[in-house]
Curated annotation (Swiss-Prot):
Its main location: nucleus. This is EKC/KEOPS complex subunit PCC1. GO terms for biological process: cellular response to pheromone; maintenance of translational fidelity; positive regulation of transcription by RNA polymerase II; telomere maintenance; telomere maintenance via recombination; tRNA threonylcarbamoyladenosine metabolic process; tRNA threonylcarbamoyladenosine modification. Component of the EKC/KEOPS complex composed of at least BUD32, CGI121, GON7, KAE1 and PCC1; the whole complex dimerizes. Component of the EKC/KEOPS complex that is required for the formation of a threonylcarbamoyl group on adenosine at position 37 (t(6)A37) in tRNAs that read codons beginning with adenine. The complex is probably involved in the transfer of the threonylcarbamoyl moiety of threonylcarbamoyl-AMP (TC-AMP) to the N6 group of A37. PCC1 functions as a dimerization module for the complex. The EKC/KEOPS complex also promotes both telomere uncapping and telomere elongation. The complex is required for efficient recruitment of transcriptional coactivators. Keywords: Activator, Chromosome, Nucleus, Telomere, Transcription, Transcription regulation, tRNA processing. One of its GO terms (molecular function) is chromatin DNA binding. GO terms for cellular component: chromatin; chromosome, telomeric region; EKC/KEOPS complex; nucleoplasm. Pfam families: Pcc1. Belongs to the CTAG/PCC1 family. It is found in: Nucleus; Chromosome, Telomere. InterPro entries: CTAG/Pcc1.
Length: 88
């Protein structure tokens, strides 16, 4: 019988991303929040905003998963910022 070790999400990172306005930070947070994580047992992300700053907290099982997940989220944030620039 093989015993499965529980994976702990002990690799963490917090990003603080400033926006020009509180409204932009709130919009970015709301746009990203519904996105499902494919393997929540390996990688988790929480979004919040305080004034004009979007806070993103990442947790993962290892540094590789953290790097890949963070890279993907940053690409999404970049797209959101570009859309805000075009629409404003």
């Amino acid at each position: 019988m093989t015993s499965k070790r529980e994976k702990s999400l002990d690799h963490t990172l917090e990003l603080k991303i400033p926006f020009e306005t509180e409204r932009q930070a709130t919009i970015a947070t709301k746009v990203l929040s519904p996105d499902p994580i494919l393997k929540p047992q390996d990688f988790q992300v929480d979004y919040s905003s305080e004034k004009n700053v979007m806070l993103v907290q990442f947790r993962s099982i290892d540094d590789r998963v953290l790097r890949v997940g963070v890279s993907s989220i940053i690409d999404s944030i970049k797209t959101i910022v570009e859309a805000m620039d075009v629409l404003s």
